[in-house]
Amino acid sequence: HTITKHFAPILPFTCDEIWQDMPHRDTDDGRNVLLNQMPESFEAYALPAETMARWDTVMKLRQDVNGVLEKARADKRIGKALEAHVTLQTTSQELQKACEGVNLAEVCIVSTCDWSAPEEGAEVAQGVNFPELTVGVSEAKGTKCPRCWMHSLDANAEGLCPRCAEVMAKFPDLA
């Protein structure tokens, strides 16, 4: 409901189609999404300060990784970011704690990312945002998934990574 109202100024036709097919509150004008009041406050949607701080840390780490990815790309060690295996090493327990439970490979848009020493021959650099961080970038190992382009050591017979294989198993008609 609220998202439809928020996106209406930039996606008016799409939001109006959604609006026409959804149930409405008594205070809504059901004729068109643009005939309704926008929510006055976004405070109800704000994340807690500690969550914002955590994601700020994760995004700064991503900036550090992207800098090393660009250098590795310029040095022709990798082509696309999805062809990269990233290693992270730090003495900061706070930085590791902020990244706990976060899929850093997904956040950094690389095939694999883990907390370990850089591989031999990897592009290695210190973090700009986190000088105590060492980022290593090397070529990802494994088979390139034809569906998501991630490289995986656990590809199935069709070459699909485990994640894509799981998704495709739910839709056997598409296989």
PLM regions with names:
Residues C145-C148, C161-C164:
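Short cysteine-rich clusters marking metal-coordination/redox-active sites
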Residues A140-T143, A155-N156:
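Flanking scaffold residues of small Cys/His-coordinated metal-binding clusters
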Residues H1-V68, A72-S92, Q96, D114-A117, ...:
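Acidic, turn-prone loop/beta-hairpin segments
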Residues V102-P118:
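A glycine-rich helix N-cap at a beta->alpha junction
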Residues K71, R147-M150:
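Generic detector of well-ordered secondary structure
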Residues D21-M22, C99-V102, H151:
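Residue-level signal for well-ordered alpha-helical positions
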Residues M150-N156, A169:
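Short functional micro-motifs and their immediate structural scaffolds
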